[in-house]
Structure formats: structure tokens, C-alpha cells
């Protein structure tokens, strides 16, 4: 019988020492997607907990998160839980309890927006500043770092020089979005959803007003653009800028998408894993932030899962083509053209082969008309006949040679429904001992080492060469574990015969012991102490744009020197016209109406207001040319002012429950 004698230690010689560890941070709607993100190469995953997670329909139970944590930690990967909504006073106590529960599950960090959380009695969990904190300046970044944030998510609108300046001024880890949907407004500075519907983006319930069609009018009422999706951005794609972002100081590379499905997360995670690995391999000063190597069983493509077109936004310079004005939907890639439309089928000429189940579409008068190919039949070279599941009536409106797109590649998607990746941690194996006892040492790539012994009587083998090969091969069989054998050394006094069944059991027990040792040696971060002397907030007056929604947040800002604090927009104290969006995206620039482009004298710049119209909704656009920003001006609707404040106890009571509290009428 095997004796259990596990010893683990960190061996410095086996640990890659680097001050530049790169973290690939993937989104997860649920625990199943989180596991696949890790298997496809994520160094960390961010996921919503049971509440306050800034995504209305992406919450997960404490049980699911508690089961996810050890899975991640076996790969050295981290779990960050989002608690990045602004909180009403009635929610502070439940939030405090939730944070304590999350800490007990072993999660690595909380991503937060509300500064009131820092005033609560919570465990010493590591804190990350959400993108909702609107971190655009060196002063704000340094302040957040100094009050206890270990990692800060910078605004998507920053350029390389701005990122570099923040990195040089603070010791916080710099996190930056590299892929996914773009909010047109600065994150945390969008109130249009609450103004129009009562659904607060700062509380995870955005109504997506930015994806609606608008008509743009100038100050004379003339139409500049009719019924276009003028606030809808293309999707972020920083593939080409990864090296430059590393040089600017980014260490955590974040993929957007806690609403995205599993195929999307698998694909985009795999894409950036391969991109970052190539950079790490090329440069000697970089390392990945977690353990293992990842093998993908498909070819990742950012163009084959949901996207609205690609832009690198403002990382290099302002560009005119950042908007997805024609449609906020995923139209996919061009694959050819429609040649003829019949009653129940269409003939197409294509540049790529089609398959049964493909999703195809055409754009007709700004509307995407899509259909699923039930059956396709090749009729000639690059020619197909397609029978849709259901023939859209609008297809008969198009003329020959109308462009055809594919937004679902059925064969490619099928690969993602199966096992599409494998991730294994390297282990060095050494077998020593003597005829009465075998000693097996396993050392993981992080340097965690265990020894396992097996007592018995192991005689010299008749065929020494065969016995040695059997021992090496048997010890390297780690297929049912998360490990792979990087090196196998046999240091025995001779070629001993060990029955395969005994060797297999010996190896399995050692691998289990290594699992336990690696989990025991895992070190999660903790709350960063406040700097001494205490920092001072860079402003003394905070407007509603600071999103202060509870007394604890007020106490926080007062503690650090703020004197006057206006209530958050959700408090319904801003009843007049205010900026309901502040954006770096500028419609004057997009339509070549920017005064800076036309004139060189700053004193003569004059950008008159414009209007955005959607049905009965009229929004005023004002332009602040010095910082190059557009302000979307609107007013909260009267019926919303009469609603209970979001997050309050009253707001959580349903109408039926409220009726039950009314006194019953007598006879």
C-alpha cells in the first residue's frame, strides 16, 4: 500500500520571475462559460454574483461561484466578481453581507464602482476599480490607487500616451478593454436610459438607447442624416495594438461580454490567447499571469462571432469610421451576391463554400433581412441554390447582384459545440528510491513540489531497457489529469519491475496530492492599504456625474477632502436638461462638420448645437471642442420622477405586494 507523505515547497528555480505578467481577462455570463474561458486560455474571469453586478440578467449563485473558484485556481487563474452598480442606502447592508459571503467562497477580487463599499465593514478582499468609475486622468487614477484599489480599468476612450502617463504615475495594475461592444458614452457617464425609461445603466439595466435609429439635424433644422444608428459604435478590436498597449503599461487585457454566449467567449478568448502567447514568446521580458499551455481544436476568428464591424477606437488617434451607423446587428462577412430570387429558393454566387444551416442575410433599406439556409445545393463553380427555412418576403425586393453576407458559419460553429480546447499544466517527474521503496516527486511549472512513496519489494527486471521505458511511459500517462509530463527522470539503482496497475495507482495518487498541494499554496491578494499620508480627491465639488447615491459614498468623499456633493442622477434631483450622455464620439467629426477641420484659429471655432430625433424624442447635441467631446442633452421624464428611487425598499415591492398593505374597506 502506498504511504501518504506529501511535502510541497516552492522552488524558486522553477518559477518564472517577471515584472511583466500579462493577464487575459475574459467575461462569463455563468459558471459553465467561465470554465470554458479558463480552458481556452483566460488568466482570469470576471463574473456576476447573486446581485449588484451591473448586468441585469447575468447573476450567479454563491454555490456556483464557490465551485468555480477551485477549478480556476488549479490553473493559477483568478475569479473576479462584479459588484459594480451604484447602491441605494437600503442596499448597503445586503451588499456588505454579500461581500462577506463572496470572500468566504475564495474569489480573488471584487470589481466595484460605488465608493461607499470602501466605507463598509467588509473582509480584506482585493478591490478593482470598475470601468464605471470613469478613469480618464492621472489624478483620478492615482487617487483610486492610493485609497486601496489594486487594479483599475481605464476608460476605453484613452490613447496610448494617456495610458502610459497613468501607468507611470501609479502602482496599480492597469486594465484595459481590448475587445467587444463599445458604449458610446464614457462608462458611468450615461443617464439616457434612466431619463427615458427609469432603467439605470449605472445599476446594470441599460435600455440601449444608443442602438436606436436617429435623424440628425443642424441648428437650422436641416436633415444631415436620416434614420441612422448614429450613437451605435463598431466593436472594439485591439488585436493590432497589443504590443503597443503592453509598452504603454497595460497588464490586464479585458474582453467585454458578460451577456455573450459560450461560442463567443471560447472564440475571442482563444484568439487573444494566441496573440498574447506569440508576443510573450517573441519577447523575453513577459510572462502569462497563470499556469498551463492551451491547445485549441479550431481556428479562432474574431469575424465569425458577433460583432458590428471593428475599430481600435481612440487608442492611436481619432478616426471618422468608428460608428456602426447602418445597423447595430451582426451582419457577418460578405460571401458573395444574390443572382436570382425564386418562390422558395434563391441562387447565389459566392466566394466561399456554403453549408446546410448557415445563417445568411442581406441589407434592404437599412434593415437586415436574415434567414437560415435549410438546404444548399452546389449548382456550379462558386454557384449555390439555397432553400431557406422560411423565405423572407422582403427578399423579393432585391435586384440581381445584391450583396450577400454570412453571420453564422454552421461548420465552424459546430466545432465550438464540442470539446474545442485543452489546457494542461507542466509537471516534472522524478522517480527515485530503492527495491523496498519507490519515491515519486512531482514538481509543477509554478514550483510546487510533492513526494509520494510506495513500499514494496521491487525486483530487478529481466529486460532492463523495456522496464525503464515502461516506467517512463507509465509515469507520463497524465491524460486523465490537468497535467502533462514536461520531463521524466528515473533515478533508481537499477531497472526495477513495477506492475502497471500498481504504477498507475501510484501516479494517480501523486497527481491528486499535487492538486491539493497546489491549491494549498495558492495565494490570493488582499485589500491594499490606504496610502500615508492619505490622498486628497482632485475636486472639492462633485456634480451628479460622480454617481454618489448613498450616505457611505458621501462619507468616503468627505473623508478625502470633497466639500460639496450633488446626488446621483438616479436620486431624481436633476429635473431639468442635463448631459444624459458625454461621449468622445462626435457626430460633427463623423460628418465632416468639425470646426477644427475647417479652421486653424482656435478663437474662431464655433460648433453650433444639433439635434437627434427618434420619434417624439428630441435630444440636443452640444459640442465641447477643447476636450473634443459631445454632450447629449436631455431631460428626465415626469413619470419617472414619480417612481420610487432605484434600489430603495419601496422600489423592490411589487404592485400586488403593495396592494396587500392597504387597509381593507369596511362593509
Regions found by a protein language model. Give the residues of each.
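Aromatic- and glycine-enriched glycan-recognition loops and surfaces
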Residues: 57-66
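Short active-site loop/helix that positions an aromatic residue
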Residues: 118-123
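Surface-exposed amphipathic alpha-helical tracts and adjacent flexible/coil segments at the periphery
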Residues: 2-39, 44-47, 51-54, 68-69, ...
Amino acid at each position: 500500500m502506498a504511504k501518504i507523505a506529501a511535502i510541497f515547497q516552492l522552488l524558486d528555480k522553477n518559477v518564472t520571475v517577471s515584472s511583466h505578467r500579462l493577464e487575459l481577462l475574459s467575461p462569463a455570463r455563468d459558471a459553465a462559460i467561465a470554465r470554458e474561458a479558463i480552458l481556452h486560455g483566460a488568466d482570469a474571469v470576471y463574473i456576476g454574483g447573486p446581485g449588484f453586478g451591473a448586468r441585469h440578467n447575468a447573476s450567479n449563485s454563491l454555490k456556483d461561484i464557490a465551485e468555480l473558484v477551485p477549478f480556476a485556481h488549479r490553473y493559477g487563474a483568478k475569479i473576479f466578481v462584479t459588484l459594480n452598480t451604484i447602491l441605494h442606502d437600503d442596499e448597503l447592508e445586503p451588499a456588505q453581507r454579500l461581500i462577506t459571503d463572496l470572500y468566504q467562497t475564495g474569489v480573488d477580487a471584487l470589481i466595484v464602482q460605488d465608493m461607499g463599499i470602501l466605507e463598509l465593514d467588509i473582509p480584506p478582499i482585493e478591490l478593482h476599480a470598475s470601468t464605471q468609475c470613469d478613469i480618464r486622468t492621472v489624478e483620478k487614477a492615482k487617487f483610486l490607487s492610493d485609497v486601496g484599489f489594486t487594479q483599475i480599468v481605464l476608460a476605453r476612450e484613452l490613447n496610448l500616451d494617456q495610458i502610459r502617463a497613468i501607468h507611470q504615475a501609479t502602482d496599480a495594475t492597469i486594465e484595459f478593454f481590448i475587445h467587444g461592444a463599445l458604449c458610446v458614452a464614457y462608462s458611468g457617464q450615461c443617464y439616457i436610459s434612466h431619463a427615458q425609461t427609469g432603467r439605470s445603466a449605472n445599476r446594470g439595466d441599460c435600455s440601449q438607447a444608443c442602438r436606436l435609429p436617429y435623424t440628425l439635424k443642424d441648428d437650422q433644422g436641416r436633415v444631415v442624416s436620416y434614420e441612422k444608428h448614429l450613437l451605435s459604435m463598431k466593436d472594439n478590436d485591439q488585436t493590432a495594438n497589443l504590443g503597443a498597449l503592453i509598452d504603454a503599461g497595460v497588464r490586464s487585457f479585458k474582453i467585454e461580454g458578460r451577456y455573450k454566449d459560450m461560442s463567443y467567449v471560447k472564440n475571442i478568448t482563444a484568439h487573444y490567447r494566441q496573440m498574447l502567447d506569440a508576443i510573450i514568446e517573441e519577447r523575453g521580458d513577459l510572462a502569462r499571469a497563470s499556469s498551463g499551455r492551451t491547445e485549441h481544436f479550431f481556428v479562432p476568428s474574431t469575424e465569425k462571432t458577433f460583432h458590428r464591424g471593428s475599430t481600435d477606437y481612440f487608442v492611436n488617434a481619432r478616426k471618422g469610421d468608428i460608428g456602426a451607423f447602418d445597423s447595430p446587428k451582426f451582419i457577418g462577412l460578405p460571401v458573395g451576391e444574390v443572382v436570382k430570387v425564386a418562390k422558395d429558393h434563391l441562387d447565389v454566387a459566392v466566394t466561399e463554400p456554403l453549408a446546410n444551416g448557415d445563417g445568411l442575410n442581406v441589407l434592404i433599406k437599412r434593415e437586415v433581412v436574415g434567414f437560415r439556409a435549410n438546404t444548399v445545393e452546389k449548382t456550379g463553380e462558386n454557384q449555390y441554390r439555397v432553400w431557406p427555412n422560411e423565405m423572407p418576403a422582403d427578399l423579393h425586393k432585391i435586384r440581381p447582384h445584391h450583396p450577400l453576407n454570412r453571420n453564422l458559419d454552421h461548420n465552424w460553429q459546430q466545432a465550438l459545440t464540442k470539446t474545442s480546447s485543452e489546457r494542461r499544466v507542466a509537471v516534472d517527474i522524478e522517480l527515485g528510491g530503492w527495491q523496498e521503496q519507490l519515491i515519486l516527486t512531482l514538481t509543477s511549472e509554478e514550483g510546487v513540489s510533492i513526494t509520494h512513496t510506495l513500499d514494496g519489494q521491487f525486483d530487478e527486471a529481466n529486460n532492463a531497457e523495456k522496464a525503464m521505458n515502461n516506467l517512463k511511459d507509465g509515469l507520463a500517462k497524465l491524460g486523465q489529469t490537468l497535467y502533462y509530463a514536461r520531463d521524466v527522470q528515473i533515478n533508481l539503482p537499477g531497472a526495477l519491475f513495477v506492475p502497471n496497475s500498481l504504477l498507475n495507482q501510484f501516479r494517480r495518487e501523486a497527481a491528486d496530492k499535487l492538486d491539493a498541494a497546489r491549491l494549498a499554496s495558492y495565494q490570493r491578494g488582499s485589500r491594499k492599504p490606504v496610502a500615508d499620508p492619505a490622498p486628497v480627491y482632485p475636486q472639492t465639488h462633485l456634480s451628479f456625474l460622480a454617481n454618489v447615491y448613498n450616505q457611505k459614498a458621501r462619507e468616503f468623499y468627505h473623508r478625502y477632502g470633497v466639500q460639496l456633493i450633488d446626488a446621483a442622477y438616479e436620486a431624481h434631483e436633476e429635473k431639468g436638461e442635463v448631459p444624459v450622455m458625454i461621449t468622445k464620439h462626435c457626430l460633427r467629426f463623423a460628418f465632416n462638420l468639425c470646426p477644427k477641420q475647417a479652421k486653424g484659429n482656435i478663437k474662431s471655432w464655433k460648433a453650433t448645437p444639433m439635434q437627434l430625433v427618434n420619434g417624439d424624442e428630441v435630444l440636443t447635441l452640444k459640442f465641447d471642442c477643447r476636450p473634443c467631446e459631445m454632450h447629449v442633452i436631455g431631460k428626465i421624464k415626469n413619470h419617472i420622477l414619480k417612481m420610487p428611487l432605484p434600489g430603495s425598499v419601496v422600489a423592490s415591492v411589487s404592485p400586488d405586494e403593495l396592494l396587500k398593505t392597504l387597509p381593507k374597506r369596511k362593509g
